[in-house]
Design a protein with these regions (language model features):
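Short, small/polar-rich motifs associated with maturation and membrane association
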Residues: 1-345, 357-359
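Flexible glycine-rich, low-complexity coil/linker segments exposed to the extracellular/periplasmic environment
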Residues: 231, 235-286, 386-425, 474-477, ...
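Flexible loop and strand-edge segments within Gram-negative outer membrane beta-barrel domains
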Residues: 229-231, 278-317, 321-324, 335-419, ...
């Protein structure tokens, strides 16, 4: 009896490649081709034919129902991913494990952030995740499994990617599209399998592989989004600042002592009427340094497929994230934050014989980071702390003879220092760049030894890990000047008498470098 037909999936009605069609208890069998078609010759007296494929429920059809063989529909197994857990020595059924193990579906990790660890919060039971910065390139979260379990310096969980230990920065840069399985060991099971390194728990990530006899599938995802602060602190304007300052001094002047007004009525009136921004400055430092929002982009492309021998999965991701810092008009270089990531995953496998399989997996991460030389968190702090009316952010070009460089305003600080804080000058004074590269490669051989004893397998694996790092910081000393007097020329122009204060300025961008690998 010759049986012919096509096997399709219940999910999308598309043909399934590589379905095993066989008669149980015999060597009679066939495999569906690239179009899902099969042909099977069975002897007379055969009662049932079985259809089986990984990820689908096995189906049996009675030979007597010949019409049912023309179009066979397999139903996806709803619990196939939840039932399989990746552990130290391979995969096991979840019900066979007695420890606290959680399997995370990769789809739950797909968030708008470019860092995988930021998606942990509130989605994985037992995992504590805290994000202390929103700065692009430095916004990865710190995370612990069931709290901190050791007293040593390293309190982070053990991270395993395709059988090899990795650092948390590499974990942050694994795109969810490349993840096949994500398992978390949360109790003594981790220590039993991985020794003392597993005392803080273990996260095991396995990347996708190709599939034998599968048509090439190409997936593309393009995203563009807007980032902005969730809340901006309200800051008093210069007039309110001066009036409140004077009021605070007045209420704190002891009885019997004469109250001395710090800000004169003339200065308050001039500031309110915006007579001259250099004589009566009113600096909104936050608006000078920060934008309202920024635009970010990312792209992901992956290709998956395979023939009867070789199968493959290739993934490429590009992330481009920007900060919300402005570029001062006087600056000759970019002072905003920019984080670029180029991530590549290449997995190639081959079924050399019926019992021998080889696999090569390579993960490459190229990270580029540009930022102002001043810490961004400090710049934000300075915008809240700096005096808004003591001096202008910058004086007009030409205010100091024979000086073509930017002339930043300043004044002695309230605590006796030679200069105060000028956030605008600190943003403008330099930039830093950092280039980091990670490469992890694993080569494995799996040998089926069923001919020795059923279920026996041997795996051999070698791995290579490399990190290179290079950083450059360049900065100059701003020219700080204090206004001692000014002249109103009567024609709408002014002459300012400026005096250099603090450390002498310099226009030379001095370098500072560092590298390792």
């Amino acid at each position: 009896i010759v049986l012919q037909g096509t096997v399709i999936s219940s999910a999308d009605n598309k043909p399934i490649v590589g379905v095993s069609v066989y008669v149980e208890g015999t060597t009679i069998g066939a495999t569906s081709d690239i179009n899902g078609n099969y042909t099977l010759k069975v002897p007379a007296g055969t009662k049932h034919v079985t259809f089986a494929f990984l990820g689908y429920d096995t189906k049996k059809i009675a030979v007597a129902d010949v019409e049912l063989f023309k179009l066979v529909t397999l139903i996806e197994a709803s619990n196939v991913m939840d039932d399989v857990v990746v552990v130290a020595f391979g995969t096991q059924k979840k019900e066979s494990l007695v420890g606290a193990v959680q399997v995370v579906r990769p789809s739950t990790l797909k968030v708008t952030s470019s860092n995988l660890s930021t998606s942990f919060a509130g989605k994985i039971a037992g995992v504590i995740s805290t994000q202390s910065s929103g700065e692009p390139g430095a916004d990865g979260a710190n995370f612990w499994i069931r709290g901190i379990s050791t007293f040593g310096a390293n309190k982070s969980p053990l991270l395993i990617l395709d059988g090899v230990e990795i650092v948390s920065e590499m974990l942050n840069n694994i795109p969810p599209e490349a993840i096949e399985s994500f398992s978390i060991l949360r109790d003594a099971t981790a220590t039993a399998l991985y020794g003392s390194r597993g005392a803080n728990g273990v996260m095991i990530i396995t990347t996708k592989n190709g599939r034998q006899s599968e048509k090439m599938a190409i997936n593309v995802r393009l995203e563009s989004g807007i980032s902005m602060p969730t809340r901006v602190q309200d800051i008093a304007d210069g007039v309110t600042y001066m009036e409140n300052y004077n009021e605070a001094l007045r209420t704190r002047t002891p009885a019997g002592e004469t109250y001395v007004q710090h800000f004169s009525d003339e200065k308050i009136t001039g500031t309110r009427n915006r007579l001259n921004p250099y004589v009566y400055p009113d600096n909104d430092w936050y608006s000078m340094l920060f934008k309202d929002f920024t635009v970010n982009e990312n792209m992901n492309l992956n290709v998956r497929g395979g023939g009867t021998v070789v199968y493959y999965f290739l993934n490429a991701s590009i992330f481009n994230e920007n900060g919300i810092l402005k570029k001062p008009a006087e600056s000759k270089f970019n002072t905003n934050i920019n984080s670029q990531k180029y991530l590549f995953q290449a997995n190639v496998g081959a079924q050399l014989t019926r019992t021998t399989r080889v696999s090569l997996k390579m993960n490459t991460q190229l990270l580029f980071w540009h930022r102002p030389v001043e810490e961004v968190k400090d710049l934000f702090y300075y915008t809240m702390r700096a005096n808004p009316v003591a001096f202008p952010a910058i004086y007009p070009k030409g205010s100091v003879e024979d000086l073509d460089d930017p002339i930043f305003g300043n004044a002695p600080s309230w605590d006796g220092g030679s200069t105060d804080i000028n956030p605008y000058a600190l943003l403008s004074r330099g930039y830093g760049q950092r280039h980091t590269q990670y490469i992890t490669t694993t080569f494995s051989v799996d040998q089926d030894l069923d001919f020795v004893t059923k279920g026996l397998k041997v795996r051999g694996m070698v791995s290579f890990y490399n990190k290179t790092y290079a950083a450059t910081y360049r900065s100059f000393s701003p020219y700080y000047y204090e206004m001692t007097d000014y002249t109103d020329n009567g024609d709408g122009t002014f002459d300012y008498n400026l005096q250099s204060i603090g450390t002498p300025g310099s226009s030379y961008l001095g370098p500072s470098t560092g590298r390792n690998g």
